[in-house]
Structure formats: C-alpha cells, structure tokens
C-alpha cells in the first residue's frame, strides 16, 4: 500500500500507482493451469495440473494461433524446464472457427446502416424509413463499426434459440466463414417446424419400444437407415463436421417422414427411429428436443439419455454398385448382391448393354476384386 499510494510528480496531489502493467498475453498464457484448481493461494496446483493437463481441445479464432497459443507454449516450456509443470505442450488439438459475416450497407451520405434499417426489393436495397436506395457493400466479418451486426435477441424473439444454433452449424464447416442471411435462418426455422409436426403427427405415448427386429423390407429399411444416419452423425460430430451432421439429421427426418405406418408394429419402429432422431438433434437444438422427448411419452430427461449405439449388422449393405472397366477404363456400373459368386458377376458384366459395345470378342482376362471392381481385358 505504501508503494501504491504516492504523490503525483506533476500536480503534487494524492495518486495511486498502476499495478496492472503486464501485457494481456502474458497474463492469459497459463490460465488453463490455474483453472485446474482454484481453491488455493498459489499459482497453480501441480497435482491438479498433472491430472487435467494438457488441454484436450482448444477452440478459438485463427488469430490465436500466432499470438496466444505461441506464448502459451513458451510458458509451458519454461515452467517445465524449472520443474514446475509436467507438460511441454499446453494443447493436444486446435480447432479454429470461422467468422460470422454479413453484407454491409451505406446510405447516400456514406454512413453505415444496420441490416434492420434496410429492406430488399428485387435486387436492390432501400432504407426502411426514407425509401432511398442504399449502397450495398461487401460481405464482411460482423463488426460494430460497420454496423453489419444482428442482435441475437431479435433472432431469439422471432425464431427461438434453437433456430439460431441450427442455422449457424448447418451453413458451412466450422473453420470457414459463414454469411448470416434471413433466408438461411428462415429455412432452419421451417425445418424445425416440420420436425415438430412429425413429433405430433401420431400419438406415440403408449407405444412401447420392445424388440427391434424387423421382419419385412419396409421396416428393415427404416431401421437400417436409422443406424446409418446415427453412424454418420456420430462421426461428423467427433470430427467437428457439424454441417454434415445436420445434413444426416435432415436425411433421417425424411426417411421417417416418408415411412408409412399401417400397424402397431410400424409405430414401434417409427417411435424407435424418432427417439434416435431426437437424441441426435439434442446437442444442436436442446430446447425443442427436450419437449419432443416428452411428447412421445418419455418421463425421464432427454439430457440423461445415452448417445445412440451403433449396431454394425444394420450398417452392412445387401447390395453394392460395382464399376466395370474395359482395359482399365470405366464403361458401366452394375448393382449386385454382396454375396454374389464370381461366375454370376462375370455373366452380369458381359451382358451389360454398354459393355457389349466394347467387348466384341472373347476377353483375354476378367479381373474381379470382390465387392470393389471388375476389369475386362480384351
């Protein structure tokens, strides 16, 4: 306190010395070590740091890769050298997300305008109040200075938080910039409405999901597609391909929506597939998913459910599309059963209409790589 409280050398008045003089990067380069145990008076707990570190996944803007992450590495290497921490590298994996962008607008006086102050008519933009034509600029990273920002509260009020989350993740891979558009938000909102209608289409509250063992092709196809898309969503999320996960969720929705229920057994299969769909959607749209889970008759919380397991027997394809080559060049394709014999596949390949144009004599050799490719040598 004696050092902090002093006399100003210019005006001789009472003053306080500034204590926060470290650069921000200096102070933020080892916070993850401190976060492992907050309940002490030392810099960080070596025991807790040994348990938690290194950080499994770092997510941040690309600008961090050459500033914050670089300094963090320096700190960890220095602390490791003086035996204060066991790691040399602070982070196992890095994912740099893109920016949310929006078109910029200016009025006739070259003043920036908010998107909410502008409306579109045909291919031109106009000022909401004056109806004057507006200058349409580049699509750039959202910034307050250029006013190309969207108030999240407006989106939540008009569409709900789930719609905003769904659109942001569905538009493009997370590492790429995305353009925020009203049409894109509206499209996400329409899909969630279709999902809601599917959930409420039939009363599934009294349907018990018992043994899932389809006995006909229609039911088998639904279950196979369900597990196929469960597998796709799972892998996509693990690899941060959220846009691909949402594409698979949309595909599963279409399969369920097109499934015709003609008996109680059909409702069992449908409820099972809908249950899987709800769980897959829940990390992206938690609010509507929790409601949907309750509507189909569940009394427990959706957030307490396990992630769907993969049943590999349903991922196996009964039929495959095999390319046919003639002297190494692809000339046709045939669809065959996975257990087809080599003699049968030879007959099918040689009887293919397009192959007959190129194979006019007895082939010298027919090379078959099972379930992969056929090459006819002439």
At which residue positions do the language-model features occur?
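Structured secondary-structure scaffolds
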Residues: 1-200, 225-257, 272-279, 376
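A generic structural signal for well-ordered coil/turn residues at beta-strand boundaries
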Residues: 2, 26, 90, 95, ...
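NTP/phosphate- and nucleic-acid-binding module
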Residues: 11, 22, 40-41, 212-215, ...
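Short secondary-structure junction motifs
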Residues: 86-89, 289, 360-363
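Acidic, turn-prone loop/beta-hairpin segments
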Residues: 94-119, 207-232, 247, 251, ...
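Long, well-ordered alpha-helical segments
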Residues: 197-209
């Amino acid at each position: 306190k004696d050092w902090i409280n002093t006399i100003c050398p210019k005006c001789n008045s009472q003053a306080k010395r500034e204590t926060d003089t470290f650069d921000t990067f200096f102070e933020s380069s080892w916070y993850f070590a401190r976060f492992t145990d907050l309940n002490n008076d030392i810099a960080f707990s070596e025991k807790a740091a040994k348990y938690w570190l290194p950080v499994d996944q770092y997510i941040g803007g690309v600008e961090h890769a050459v500033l914050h992450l670089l300094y963090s590495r320096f700190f960890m290497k220095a602390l490791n050298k003086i035996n204060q921490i066991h790691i040399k590298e602070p982070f196992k994996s890095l994912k740099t997300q893109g920016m949310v962008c929006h078109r910029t607008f200016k009025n006739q006086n070259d003043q920036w305008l908010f998107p909410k102050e502008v409306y579109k008519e045909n291919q031109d933009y106009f000022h909401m109040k004056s109806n004057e034509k507006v200058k349409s600029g580049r699509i750039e990273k959202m910034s307050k200075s250029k006013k190309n920002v969207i108030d999240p509260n407006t989106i939540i009020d008009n569409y709900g938080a789930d719609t905003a989350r769904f659109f942001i993740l569905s538009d493009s891979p997370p590492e790429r910039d995305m353009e925020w558009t009203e049409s894109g938000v509206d499209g996400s909102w329409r899909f969630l409405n279709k999902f809601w209608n599917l959930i409420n289409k039939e009363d599934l509250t009294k349907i018990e999901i018992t043994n899932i063992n389809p006995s006909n092709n229609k039911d088998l196809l639904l279950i196979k597609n369900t597990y196929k898309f469960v597998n796709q969503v799972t892998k996509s999320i693990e690899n941060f391909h959220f846009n691909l996960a949402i594409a698979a969720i949309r595909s599963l929705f279409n399969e369920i929506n097109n499934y015709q229920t003609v008996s109680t057994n059909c409702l069992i299969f449908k409820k099972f597939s809908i249950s899987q769909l709800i769980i897959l959607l829940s990390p992206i749209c938690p609010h509507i998913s929790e409601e949907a889970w309750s509507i189909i008759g569940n009394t427990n919380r959706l957030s307490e459910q396990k992630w769907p397991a993969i049943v590999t027997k349903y991922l196996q394809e009964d039929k495959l599309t095999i390319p046919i080559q003639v002297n190494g060049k692809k000339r046709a394709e045939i669809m065959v059963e996975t257990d087809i014999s080599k003699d049968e596949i030879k007959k099918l390949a040689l009887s293919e209409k397009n192959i007959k144009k190129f194979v006019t004599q007895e082939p010298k050799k027919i090379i078959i790589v099972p379930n992969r490719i056929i090459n006819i040598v002439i």
